[in-house]
Amino acid sequence: MVRLEKNDPLMLARQLPLKTVALILAGGRGTRLKDLTIKRAKPAVHFGGKFRIIDFALSNCLNSGIRRIGVITQYQSHTLVQHIQRGWSFFSEEMNEFVDLLPAQQRVHGENWYRGTADAVTQNLDIIRRYGAEYIVILAGDHIYKQDYSHMLIDHVEKGARCTVACLPVPVAEAAAFGVMDVDENDLIIDFVEKPANPPTMPSDPTKSLASMGIYIFDAEYLYDLLEEDDKDENSSHDFGKDIIPKITKAGMAYAHPFPLSCVQSDPTAEPYWRDVGTLEAYWKANLDLASVTPELDMYDQNWPIRTHMESLPPAKFVQDRSGSHGMTLNSLVSGGCIISGSVVVQSVLFPRVRINSFCNIDSSVLLPDVWIGRSCRLRRCVIDRACIIPEGMVIGENAEEDARRFYRSEEGIVLVTREMLRKLQIKQER
């Protein structure tokens, strides 16, 4: 048993994570990302040149001192499981450290898979209890942010809360996609509504609503009792946002934790960074922001590194083609194993092993691993899925009608290209 030094914040920051287990909900399909998630769960989607989305929640746990982690999986989990096995298998069993994969197995309710976010935890309660944690951190595996959970744990303990919900002001126009809360002067949550049609505004700012980030801390035994009670409720949807948090709020046991208090950022004057990259435009925009001169998310902070599975790849190469054209980039991220031959890449993100042949112009695009671009192509405002082969002379992103006919084009004009779409155009996808 770790004795808490409640008067010493530094000691609390070290001690509380040792008494904590993090559960990452990573079974979501992410339908708003369209064909990007047909063959992979949203947390397994590539992001930022070399990472997967789930790497951010996992890295936050590691950097916060939480080294007992359960990852709850369901939809199209193979890619996600493989990534975690390859990139996150360094924890020490002798030190009681682990990343435990918890797939849906129909273990509790016969033919039912996970019926909701809360049920995903309920169906694994027998395993989770054996972890012997005093605190449980519930995390979404599909958000991009940097947060020190030890600071949120301190806030939870000092307030005497049974449940703490991380929150962030969002524009009212966007609030309908979140759980929205109202709090008193002590951060006690006095009202909570999940995805309201008419979101209530913050008294201090009528243009904003106070939104739940889907990050929760519970006293462990309190959570177990709640979930067992919820499991027996036939009228429940077994979801944290729809059922559990509103119930705790009515009991006066839930507190809010302002995200700026635990957000990790290099520039303390900057706006706290948190993104739900759940739509194609949000995903494209968040990736391209990383390639800007001063990105909102600092990926180069050595004090808070983002880990991932590291392949052994040669350096990126920019070469002159036989005609004398130079391969060059501007304001772009280019990962290992990429070769740019006699082409220009501007404000784009290239994942590992991308090959761009001569006379191409790539602008404001995201190219996932193993993409091959033939000669004389022009790509603008695109997301090209893994291992796509773009044939010589293809133009994408310049003709809205043509893009919508061949590929998926969002309302904002972002074009998604997949191997299946190219095959339907009779374009061979094997080299």
UniProtKB/Swiss-Prot annotation:
Q: Which residues bind beta-D-fructose 1,6-bisphosphate?
A: K39, R419, E420, M421, L422, R423, Q429, E430, R431
> What's a single GO BP term from this record?
glycogen biosynthetic process
Q: In which pathway does it act?
A: Glycan biosynthesis; glycogen biosynthesis
Reaction catalysed? alpha-D-glucose 1-phosphate + ATP + H(+) = ADP-alpha-D-glucose + diphosphate
Molecular function in Gene Ontology: ATP binding; glucose-1-phosphate adenylyltransferase activity
Q: List the EC numbers from the record.
A: 2.7.7.27
The keyword Transcription regulation appears for this protein: no
| InterPro entries reported for this sequence | ADP-Glc_PPase, ADP_Glu_pyroP_CS, GlgC_bac, GlmU/GlgC-like_hexapep, NTP_transferase_dom, Nucleotide-diphossugar_trans, Trimer_LpxA-like_sf
Name the Pfam families on file: Hexapep_GlmU, NTP_transferase
Give the PROSITE patterns listed for this entry.
ADP_GLC_PYROPHOSPH_1 (PS00808), ADP_GLC_PYROPHOSPH_2 (PS00809), ADP_GLC_PYROPHOSPH_3 (PS00810)
| Record: residues binding AMP | R40, H46, R52, R130, R386
| Keywords for the protein's UniProt record, in alphabetical order | Allosteric enzyme, ATP-binding, Carbohydrate metabolism, Glycogen biosynthesis, Glycogen metabolism, Nucleotide-binding, Nucleotidyltransferase, Transferase
- How is this protein activated or inhibited? Allosterically activated by fructose-1,6-bisphosphate (F16BP) and inhibited by AMP.
Task: Cite the position(s) of the site with description Could play a key role in the communication between the regulatory and the substrate sites.
Answer: Q74, W113
Q: How does it assemble?
A: Homotetramer.
Annotated family: Belongs to the bacterial/plant glucose-1-phosphate adenylyltransferase family.
NCBIfam families per the UniProt record, alphabetical: glgC, PRK00725.1, PRK00844.1
Protein name per its UniProtKB record: Glucose-1-phosphate adenylyltransferase
